[in-house]
């Protein structure tokens, strides 16, 4: 299954939760989900009972769309999380959080993970001084993530950094807004990660 590239707000309405796919519109209260908090389509406002499988599938879709990960890659991450010590669901979320595009987003260099992924793909991001253009690159604690010199004054990046005054920056990164770089100081604990996903249901889905 390829990565979804369609209208992102339809996805949020279908899943019934904000996935931080539209940065400024969400912060301004202008997202389609807030205006129409029901699934798109002719019968969107009808309430229907969701099966156990449907609930499990919905949680997987939330995580996939939120982090921008295709099915094959997501399944491989789950297998890796399952081999690790500790809680499989929490391991999965922590692996997703360590993706380079997500770390760029968490540092406030992009208002959405989608824009962060574009920055990485187009070579605007350096890791420990070297250009890395792979969004799934796994960041390690202590690594320096920086926007390359020619791109630091990009209006979208600067606007993203301005918005962090309103949204804040997560505690597991240290960011220098003026020099546009940050340090991934540690792997976050699950309770620190503010995503509306019940990973337990994802584990149940893949364990069948």
From Swiss-Prot:
Keyword Cell division (UniProt): no
One Pfam family named in its UniProt record: Ribosomal_S4
Q: Name one GO molecular function term.
A: rRNA binding
Per its UniProt record, what InterPro entries does this chain match? Ribosomal_uS4, Ribosomal_uS4_bac-type, Ribosomal_uS4_CS, Ribosomal_uS4_N, S4_RNA-bd, S4_RNA-bd_sf
Q: Name one GO biological process term.
A: translation
Against PROSITE patterns, the record matches this protein to: RIBOSOMAL_S4, S4
Q: Where is this region: Disordered?
A: 30-49
Which UniProt keyword terms apply here?
Answer: Ribonucleoprotein, Ribosomal protein, RNA-binding, rRNA-binding
Q: Which Gene3D superfamilies match?
A: Ribosomal Protein S4 Delta 41, Chain A, domain 1, RNA-binding S4 domain
Q: Which residue numbers delimit the S4 RNA-binding domain?
A: 98-161
UniProt GO cellular component terms = small ribosomal subunit
Please report which protein family the annotation says this sequence is part of. Belongs to the universal ribosomal protein uS4 family.
Q: How does it assemble?
A: Part of the 30S ribosomal subunit. Contacts protein S5. The interaction surface between S4 and S5 is involved in control of translational fidelity.
Task: Tell me, in a sentence or two, what this protein's role is.
Answer: One of the primary rRNA binding proteins, it binds directly to 16S rRNA where it nucleates assembly of the body of the 30S subunit. With S5 and S12 plays an important role in translational accuracy.
The record's NCBIfam families line, in alphabetical order, gives: PRK05327.1, rpsD_bact
Protein name per its UniProtKB record: Small ribosomal subunit protein uS4
Instruction: Specify the taxonomic lineage.
Output: Bacteria, Pseudomonadati, Campylobacterota, Epsilonproteobacteria, Nautiliales
